[in-house]
């Protein structure tokens, strides 16, 4: 089954609506995080599609363990970046069958001192 593709304008306009008119957020999402193949075909229309992709992939792994969260529960935690906020490479790579992407990223942790340093980043 062939997966639906979207034009840049379709993805941008849907993302613009998702981000309540924030053009920068919409452009960054389409340019950096929407799933694309090596030919530049766009397979996600908005961050809603991305959150479902990530939720479905995480739920697939979760199902192997007791008390697994469902795709819907995971989606609800991510939708509109509410609670779980994937960052950078993981946002592009999790569940992406079109490109190989790193799933690692840096994390900022709480510190008692100055958090504006290399020491605050793992």
What is the role of each PLM region?
Residues 1-122:
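Extended catalytic cores of very large enzyme megasubunits
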